[in-house]
């Protein structure tokens, strides 16, 4: 079969339309996962009784199992539970009304939360303990020290890891095609199925992922420069 160069362009035009959905499934899990990670960090730092073990189990489970399983567990497990809740409380709605992409975002948010917990924790461990001691010496409480010194510095140190995770999640969105979410890779498969030009379609998809990754890497450089103002904490 002859290689079809023009089809790469036409396939990319269709895939470009799915970039907003793809980015949403990559960015929102990082945002929600960051909130989950902050909760985990607070639980561990303040050693909240009964929750430390739960936090460790959560992080261990989601870092030790593949994201595709998380998606399938949420995609297959949440709808029956949601329907039961709706029926019990007479809410009058069905899980079928929930966009499939929302299940993907839920699953990847839990995945991101586990990884971000370890990223932020490693950033905290990398801190100079002298800064914490200095904060205590001027009368800051532990919670104030955490909010104004520890967390800003840990986030600054962790920016490259955040970017790497974001790039990884951008690529991970490709597995959403398994539950029929039309993101970049899923759309490439669909547009290629008419004339079996799968090679051309996937080359187009690779170009789009490459460009998006370059943009994220550039954004990382900007963030690192802006975050330099947090050097030394925010006392």
Swiss-Prot record:
GO BP terms in the entry: amino acid transport
TM helices/strands, residue ranges: 23-43, 59-78, 100-120, 165-185, 196-216
CDD domains named in the record: TM_PBP2
Entry keyword annotation includes Transmembrane helix: yes
Primary localization class, coarse: membrane
Topology in membrane: Multi-pass membrane protein
SUPFAM superfamilies in the cross-refs: MetI-like (SSF161098)
Alphabetized UniProt keyword annotations: Amino-acid transport, Cell membrane, Membrane, Transmembrane, Transmembrane helix, Transport
Subcellular location: Cell membrane
PANTHER family with a match to the protein in the record: L-CYSTINE TRANSPORT SYSTEM PERMEASE PROTEIN TCYM, MEMBRANE COMPONENT OF AMINO ACID ABC TRANSPORTER
Alphabetical list of NCBIfam families matching this protein: HEQRo_perm_3TM
Oligomeric and partner information: The complex is composed of two ATP-binding proteins (TcyN), two transmembrane proteins (TcyL and TcyM) and two solute-binding proteins (TcyJ and TcyK).
Family: Belongs to the binding-protein-dependent transport system permease family.
Name of the protein in its database record: L-cystine transport system permease protein TcyM
Organism of derivation: Bacillus subtilis (strain 168)
Name of encoding gene: tcyM
């Amino acid at each position: 079969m002859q290689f079809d160069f023009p089809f790469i362009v036409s396939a990319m035009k269709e895939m470009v339309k799915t970039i907003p959905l793809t980015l949403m499934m990559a960015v929102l899990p990082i945002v929600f996962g960051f909130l989950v990670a902050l909760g985990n960090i607070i639980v561990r730092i303040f050693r909240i009784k009964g929750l430390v073990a739960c936090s460790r189990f959560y992080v261990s489970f989601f870092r030790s199992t593949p994201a595709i399983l998380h998606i399938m567990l949420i995609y297959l497990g949440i709808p029956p539970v949601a329907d039961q809740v709706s029926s019990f409380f007479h809410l009058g709605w069905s899980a079928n009304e929930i966009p499939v992409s929302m299940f993907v975002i839920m699953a990847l948010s839990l995945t991101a939360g586990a990884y971000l917990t370890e990223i932020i924790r490693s950033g905290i461990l990398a801190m100079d303990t002298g800064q914490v001691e200095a904060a205590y010496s001027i009368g800051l409480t532990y919670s104030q020290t955490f909010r104004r010194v520890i967390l800003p510095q840990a986030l600054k140190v962790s920016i490259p890891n955040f970017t790497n995770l974001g790039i990884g999640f951008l690529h991970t969105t490709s597995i959403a095609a398994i539950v029929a979410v039309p993101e970049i890779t899923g759309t490439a498969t669909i547009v290629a199925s008419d004339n079996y030009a799968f090679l051309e379609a996937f080359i187009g998809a690779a170009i789009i992922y490459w460009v998006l990754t370059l943009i994220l890497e550039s954004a990382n450089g900007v963030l690192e420069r802006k975050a330099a103002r947090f050097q030394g904490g925010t006392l």
